Amino acid sequence: MKKNRLLFRVIILLILSGAVGFTLYQGYFSKEEKMEIGKEAPNFVVTDLEGKKIELKDFKGKGVFLNFWGTWCKPCEKEMPYMNELYPKYKEKGVEIIALDADETDIAVKNFVKQYDLKFPVAIDKGGEIIKTYGVIPLPTSFLIDKDGKVIQEIKGEQTKEQLEEYLKKITP
């Protein structure tokens, strides 16, 4: 009986050690890049829900609030109405909001956009390549991109209306 218990403990210890070792190995050798503040934002091309092409480099000369989100993400859901409310005011001032969904179905994203009557461009990051390029963890994560196309700040987590407005002011050309 004691032999079985000892064997069981050794097996559990080996499994846990292997899991910890694998996690450390993955973290150390991960190829994902971390977005560098002050560097040019990586360009991307997506198609929004209305079929229009969105290419980041086309927004040079404007500030860009790039938001990564998901329909299942409660903090994302809370901040979207604030973004929608502030969008017309800051669009007139040369700021664009682009919301990139984290690889969900078209129907889920379209239903969400319709439910909240979102006015800013929304696209789906099919395959999650843009999220990988920008090193996004967790959702929501947003990037402030200035008129020269440089990333000036990364914002993780849900934002209040007041915080969003401060960020939009920061990237107003």
From Swiss-Prot:
Disulfide bond entries: C73-C76
Gene: resA
Pfam family, one: AhpC-TSA
HAMAP family membership: ResA
UniProt similarity note: Belongs to the thioredoxin family. ResA subfamily.
Membrane topology: Single-pass type II membrane protein
Organism taxonomic ancestry: Bacteria, Bacillati, Bacillota, Bacilli, Bacillales
Family annotation (InterPro entries): AhpC/TSA (IPR000866), Thiol-dS_OxRdtase_ResA (IPR023555), Thioredoxin-like_sf (IPR036249), Thioredoxin_domain (IPR013766), Thioredoxin_ResA/DsbE_sf (IPR050553)
Protein name per its UniProtKB record: Thiol-disulfide oxidoreductase ResA
All residue ranges annotated as the Thioredoxin domain in the record: 35-173
Species whose genome carries this gene: Bacillus cereus (strain ATCC 10987 / NRS 248)
The keyword Transmembrane is annotated on this UniProt entry: yes
GO molecular function, one term: disulfide oxidoreductase activity
